[in-house]
């Protein structure tokens, strides 16, 4: 998913959670997996994080050694995997989400495999059921977040919907990420397209532009530099009280605060959310397909699924997986998020981004 919050991933290290030792994507010795039948190579985006104890449990139980090749953000990693599919860098790829899934499938990136535990995945996350080329692993919502202190001080009700964001009361308050360079920025664009349809989303963005929306390159700049509520407002540099981020951002604000507040300093505009789902799959031409299948099985176990929320700030997809109380209290998934079929995204994404760029950035 990335959820591509490197800030959250970095802070996780301080909690005793570790990013797995990563190989350089440019190291020629790692260009085509290890070929070692007892080593599994997992290719992923930069934000993949797992508890060391969970990984060790898998290695002890399975007899395999896991190494991780981190290959940039989700889009970069998927593109690299497609380019190297005939001689893949690893055995399993994790981190292709629903915004990029059709591109990966159309390019033959994965081979079929039904992971053990697939029947325990919540129905709304299941996809590619006829060919089983990918396994759902986690989900998350991209949503507008708001700085509670700002709206309290200004006696202004926080926006809750896409329509609210174009009202005069919220002029010059929103910062979002570039849809062509950022996963949350793209998600927000897709959410607006899902909400207003093919003929309505451009008109919406014209109104949003007229209402002073600010566009920056990526999430870190938007959240940590432009948003007034970052780190509970204590370290915020920006003056924008609205930012495109994640439904899991308010829980992170509580979990990483010292001392911990009794309430989250930020909230979520639940009517602006777009649902992301991340998948993993067995790479075509994987050197260690048997080991890759074992790793995919493990990623659907309760142990791995329970471990994800505090590592990557995403929600598990397995039934009865545990979610930290901070998530339930401060950042539950949206009840009715915007969604788009992967096929629709594949057909329209590039043109939407091109039109958005021309409309908003020029």
Tell me what each language-model feature is.
Residues 98-109, 127-157, 185-195, 275-281:
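Periplasmic solute-binding protein
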Residues 325-362:
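Extracellular/periplasmic bilobal clamshell ligand-binding domains
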Residues 27-103, 225, 362:
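Early extracytoplasmic/lumenal segment of secretory-pathway proteins
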Residues 184, 191-271:
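Ligand-binding pocket segment of bilobal, Venus flytrap-like solute-binding proteins
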Residues 21-25:
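C-terminal motif of bacterial Sec signal peptides marking the signal peptidase cleavage site
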Residues 111-119, 133-135, 163, 241, ...:
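Short beta-strand->loop
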